[in-house]
């Protein structure tokens, strides 16, 4: 397993290697105001969209077909269409099956970070080497403008209280992942008029935590979301 062959973490790898995402995680524990997971058509290719949800078994069949058709796949990831850790059974079963069948492949997950921490030991055992955490704010007053609600256990939490819980858990997750030798990338979506002047603060906080890569992503207008009126950043 060559960890340098992850195209999302190494720009040079983009020229030679590809990745495949397995859509085994339909549920999400957060409602982001920029997100609408219901939209799906042949012309829609944004992250978080899939034409079907696969069971772990179906994902393995699909993966075999992908490997048979493409000889340059170095990474198998789980990124949704919901959050992997709002679907922990499906996520971990799929990762375990992939690791057993393809011991040399790079495994990664992308998450909002709300429920990662209880599963870090299992991720390390399965040799999941890369985790991406989306952190859009490190100030709950700003986070409250980005998230409608989050589900914490059986409770739905909103506004600054919810944003504060999310931030605390994201920071805890990043620290735990780094302590286990897992590479961490932090994604931040630049939302005009919401957090665009806050991104530098987020970047500094991520650097303090030892994040390996910080990735700024310009907002893409998403029909049906609460932020559908926002324009793309300049």
Please report, for each region that a protein language model flagged, where it lies by residue.
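Active-site mouth loops of central-metabolism enzymes
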Residues: 25, 48-56, 191-196
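Short Fe-S-cluster ligation motifs
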Residues: 57-79
């Amino acid at each position: 397993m060559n960890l340098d062959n992850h195209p999302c973490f190494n720009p040079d790898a983009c020229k030679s290697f590809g990745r495949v995402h397995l859509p085994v995680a339909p549920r999400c524990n957060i409602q982001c105001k920029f997100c609408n997971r219901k939209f799906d058509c042949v012309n829609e290719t944004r992250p978080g969209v899939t034409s079907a949800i696969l069971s772990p078994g179906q994902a393995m069949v699909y993966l075999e077909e992908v490997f048979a058709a493409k000889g340059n796949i170095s990474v198998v990831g789980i990124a949704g269409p919901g959050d992997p850790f709002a679907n922990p059974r499906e996520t971990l079963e799929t990762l375990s099956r992939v690791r057993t069948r393809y011991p040399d492949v790079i495994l990664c997950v992308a998450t909002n970070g709300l429920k990662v921490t209880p599963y870090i030991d299992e991720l390390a055992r399965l040799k999941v080497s890369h985790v991406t955490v989306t952190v859009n704010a490190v100030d709950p007053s700003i986070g409250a403008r980005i998230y409608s609600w989050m589900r914490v256990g059986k409770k739905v939490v909103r506004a600054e209280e919810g944003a504060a819980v999310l931030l605390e858990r994201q920071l805890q997750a990043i620290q735990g992942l780094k302590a286990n030798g897992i590479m961490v990338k932090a994604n931040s979506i630049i939302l005009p008029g919401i957090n665009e002047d806050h991104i530098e603060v987020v970047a500094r906080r991520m650097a303090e935590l030892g994040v390996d890569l910080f990735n700024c992503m310009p907002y893409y207008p998403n029909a049906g979301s609460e932020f559908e009126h926002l324009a793309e950043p300049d």
